[in-house]
Design a protein with these regions (language model features):
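Nucleotide-activated chemistry modules centered on ATP-dependent adenylation/adenylyltransferase
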Residues: 1-44, 52-220
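Aromatic pocket-lining residues of Rossmann-like dinucleotide-binding sites
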Residues: 49
Length: 220
């Protein structure tokens, strides 16, 4: 079975939007509800997409197990968005901070505590976060919903898009396909993180990923 090139699927949509924008003097871009996992991952995604969409970043990450870590990451997200808006990189970017509810993550993770990073627990975590994104995107009348998660080389972009497309059908709102790591997207995010001096964590967020990462460092 042929694999879907989600970057090319995204480019088709963006090219159509660009043509519409060039053809209309009073063009108003579509509204995108973009789930963001963290500022570093969002840096390239926002730079790339803010020329085509009115973006509202949805910061919803109940997988972050430690409240101090959560506060640090959400503060960096807000700081990056403020910097981008000040520089007028594209259309203005807004942000909605979701509830910090790690208990929902732990309830979801029951029975999957020993899954390796990148396994079924992670897939259930993607669904948890994207489900809330789709729900609020539909309620808010957005034109699309999406996530920054596909920028990571450690994340399964095909699985993320599969979940997003399923939720699109369930909630009746278009999913914006992506594989942001393509076309040097991940490399660009590292450069932007350095440029804006963003805090760049070395684990995804949950206590399980933190423990696995610490074990890797010890055994290196």
């Amino acid at each position: 079975m042929n694999q879907v090139n989600y970057q090319k699927e995204l480019e088709k949509i963006l090219n159509t939007l660009q043509e519409k924008g060039e053809a209309a003097s009073d063009y108003r871009p579509p509204r995108l509800f973009l789930h963001s996992c963290c500022a570093p991952c969002s840096s390239y995604c926002l730079e790339y997409l803010c020329r085509y969409f009115l973006i509202t970043v949805f910061y919803y990450n109940p997988n972050i197990s430690f409240s101090e870590e959560y506060r640090k990451r959400v503060a960096e997200q807000k700081r990056l968005i403020a910097a981008y808006n000040k520089e007028e990189k594209g259309w203005p970017i807004d942000i909605v901070e979701g509830d910090y509810e790690p208990e929902r993550f732990y309830e979801m993770a029951k029975g999957y505590e020993n899954c390796p990073e990148g396994g079924e627990r992670c897939f259930r975590c993607f669904d948890l976060r994207l489900r809330k994104t789709a729900e609020l995107a539909f309620a808010g009348g957005f034109d699309y919903f999406a996530t920054t998660l596909t920028i990571s080389p450690l994340k399964n972009a095909a699985k993320i898009n599969e979940i997003g497309q399923a939720l699109s059908g369930e909630y009746g709102i278009p999913w914006l396909p992506s594989d942001f790591k393509k076309k040097n997207g991940y490399k660009r995010s590292i450069g932007l993180s350095a440029e804006y001096e963003l805090y760049r964590q070395n684990y995804c967020g949950c206590a399980f990923s933190k423990a696995e990462r610490e074990a890797q460092i010890i055994n290196a």
